[in-house]
Amino acid sequence: MQIAIIAAGCFWGVQEVYLRKFIPAAAILKTSVGYTGGITADPTYKEVCTNTTNHAEALKIEFDEKLTSYDKIIEFFFAMHDPTTSNQQGNDIGTQYRSAIFTTNPEQATIAKRVMNEVQAKHYPNKKIVTQILPAGKWWDAEDYHQLYLEKNPDGYRCSSHFLRWNVFE
């Protein structure tokens, strides 16, 4: 089992896209939404939304490395959101919506940088990817009502930028 931590806008949609579109689905063992990358301890959603904590809305993915790779998790990340917008995904604006990869070890950082460079060359030759690649810091799970939010609220808000831009699994 390995952990990936990513931020790509509203965490509800990021979680939903990974759970519904990632192949093989069995590779995703567990997901949780939460906050990381900020300066305050144990932040609340309300605090994060003030743009004063510097936390990102993020997704923690526990995955089976026998069924998929960190490379594939990261390529999927770049395919499912717009990594060229700073602190914004669709209509969601603020530092909590930034594009970021929070790496748990040096190997993940190397892979994330390599995949980002490959995606930049292949899919965004005329736009600069602004995704931050940072060492993972403290993680705080978001409040319970945020966990699997769109599964519990099928008509809930979905960010317009959360869709697959290319087939990662060809």
Swiss-Prot record:
UniProt keyword list: Cytoplasm, Nucleus, Oxidoreductase
Pfam families: PMSR
Chief place where the protein resides: cytoplasm
Keyword Protein transport set for record: no
Function: Has an important function as a repair enzyme for proteins that have been inactivated by oxidation. Catalyzes the reversible oxidation-reduction of methionine sulfoxide in proteins to methionine.
PANTHER family (UniProt xref): PEPTIDE METHIONINE SULFOXIDE REDUCTASE (PTHR43774), PEPTIDE METHIONINE SULFOXIDE REDUCTASE MSRA 2 (PTHR43774:SF1)
Record family assignment: Belongs to the MsrA Met sulfoxide reductase family.
UniProt name for this protein: Probable peptide methionine sulfoxide reductase
Phylogenetic classification of the source organism: Eukaryota, Fungi, Dikarya, Ascomycota, Taphrinomycotina
